[in-house]
UniProtKB/Swiss-Prot annotation:
The keyword NAD applies. This is 4-hydroxy-tetrahydrodipicolinate reductase. Keywords: Amino-acid biosynthesis, Cytoplasm, Diaminopimelate biosynthesis, Lysine biosynthesis, NAD, NADP, Oxidoreductase. Belongs to the DapB family. The active site is at H140, K144. Pfam families: DapB_C, DapB_N.
């Protein structure tokens, strides 16, 4: 399979290049300027449309502005597109949805298999303990731009869907006020080189249930992204998420 990795020189992008190469795929990279990642050639952004001529799938872990531009080109060429970029506004998400009308687009906030399991456990826990207070803490490296993380927002969406109501999301706390009954606390930490950690706390009278996922390496995200690309390559135009591949 011919795979184009957009953001090939980034933290996760370079891991995706390595993972896809080790699986025997033909890999080309895209970045701001021409370079290489190991034995894989990385082309400047302006050459991306030409790479689509022979591509079976694109994997993109960059920033919303770049992803939006590249997915439009891929849609025009009919090349399936895997998106790990987070932090899109409503207009950005609408653009991705529009692209999915012309090609297969798979977007996920997290490509770790363990996170998919966590989401199912979160649903079960929230359903079983409907009166418990809920707090979410997420930690990432000091270079991560969006907060809360895309994974944190996905977890919170699962909580809302399971509770069948939109809880008030309180981002951090200060001052003096009582915790609301329909409130979920959201706490963000950015420090060092932490790959990603998410903890959902369900607290009742005299007991606490803590649900945690911790990524030990970015390779887990890379493996999931390549899994997604392999699965997506033969799909028809439409909108998909990582859960569809499980």
């Amino acid at each position: 399979m011919n795979v184009v990795v957009v953001g090939a020189t980034g933290r996760t992008g370079s891991e995706i290049v390595a993972e896809a190469s080790e699986r025997g795929h033909d890999v080309s990279g895209v970045a701001r300027s021409q370079t290489s990642v190991g034995d894989v050639r990385v082309y400047p952004t302006e050459e991306f449309p030409e790479l689509l001529d022979n591509a079976d799938a694109v994997i993109d872990f960059t920033v919303p502005e770049a992803t939006r531009e590249h997915v439009q080109a891929a849609a025009a060429a009919g090349v399936p597109y895997v998106i790990g970029t987070t932090g899109f506004d409503d207009d950005g998400m609408a653009a991705l949805r529009t692209a999915s009308e012309s090609t297969a687009v798979l977007k996920a906030s997290n490509f770790a298999r363990g996170v998919q399991a966590l989401l199912r456990v979160v649903e079960a826990g929230v359903e079983a303990l409907p009166e418990y207070d809920i707090e979410l803490t997420e930690t990432h490296h000091n270079g991560k731009r969006d907060a809360p993380s895309g994974t944190a927002n996905t977890i919170l969406d699962v909580v809302d869907e399971t509770r069948d109501e939109a809880l008030d999301r309180t981002h951090g706390r200060e001052g003096e006020h009582r915790r609301g009954d329909d409130e979920v606390g959201v706490h963000v930490r950015r420090a060092g080189t932490v790959r990603g950690e998410h903890e959902l706390l369900l607290a009742g009278n005299d007991e606490v249930l803590s649900l945690t996922h911790r990524a030990e390496s970015r390779r887990v995200f890379a493996a999931g992204a390549v899994d997604a690309a392999e699965w997506l390559a033969d799909r028809s135009a439409g909108w998909y998420d990582f859960e569809d591949t499980v």
